[in-house]
């Protein structure tokens, strides 16, 4: 006599393709807050998240749309924007009293030089302690936007100097 179904229904977020529970468990077991980097078609989002029983809590967040307030003139979804957003996030986190984190890129592919690693480089350059390997980081020229100025000089304008000026403006906010 059979009892119950013979199939297994996965967790809803796994079924929707939103969560890798094996990777999530390994990140949570460290006990360190997570630096969550997510990229959309229009912006980069970086958050400091801690797990709780009721659900994860976001302690600090930075969005690439905030860069316009610092004088940034480029695209908010580019590699330089990811670098500056990571730097802005680190300044906010350090000012709030959080000095370390571990990187959580979610379901994004870990390709060397990707925008999620540009955000990591920005956070590390601003002083946040995040473990990483040197081989995954983008080149300095890509972080400053030189590759954009090379293939689209009329659209980029003076992007390299703009990125450097915005980086200095963000670092001035560090208390």
UniProtKB/Swiss-Prot annotation:
It comes from the Archaea. It holds the Pfam family Ribosomal_L5e. Part of the 50S ribosomal subunit. Contacts the 5S and 23S rRNAs. One of its GO terms (biological process) is ribosomal large subunit assembly. GO terms for cellular component: cytosolic large ribosomal subunit. GO terms for molecular function: 5S rRNA binding; structural constituent of ribosome. Keywords: Ribonucleoprotein, Ribosomal protein, RNA-binding, rRNA-binding. This is Large ribosomal subunit protein uL18. The keyword Oxidoreductase does not apply. CDD domains: Ribosomal_L18_L5e. Belongs to the universal ribosomal protein uL18 family.
């Amino acid at each position: 006599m059979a009892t119950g179904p013979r199939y297994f229904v996965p967790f809803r977020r796994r079924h929707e393709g939103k969560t890798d529970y094996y990777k999530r468990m390994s990140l949570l077991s460290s006990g360190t807050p997570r630096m969550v980097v997510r990229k959309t078609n229009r912006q980069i989002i970086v958050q400091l998240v801690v797990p709780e029983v009721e659900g994860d809590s976001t302690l600090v967040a930075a969005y690439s749309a905030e860069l316009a307030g610092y004088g940034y003139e480029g695209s908010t979804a580019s590699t330089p924007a990811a670098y500056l957003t990571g730097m802005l996030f680190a300044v906010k986190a350090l000012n709030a009293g959080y000095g370390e984190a571990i990187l959580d890129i979610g379901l994004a592919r870990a390709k060397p030089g990707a925008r999620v690693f540009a955000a990591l480089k920005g956070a590390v350059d601003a002083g946040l302690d995040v473990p990483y390997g040197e081989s995954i980081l983008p080149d300095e020229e890509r972080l400053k936007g030189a590759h954009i100025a090379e293939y689209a000089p009329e659209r980029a304008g003076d992007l390299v100097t703009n990125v450097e000026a915005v980086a200095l403006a963000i670092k001035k906010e560090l208390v």
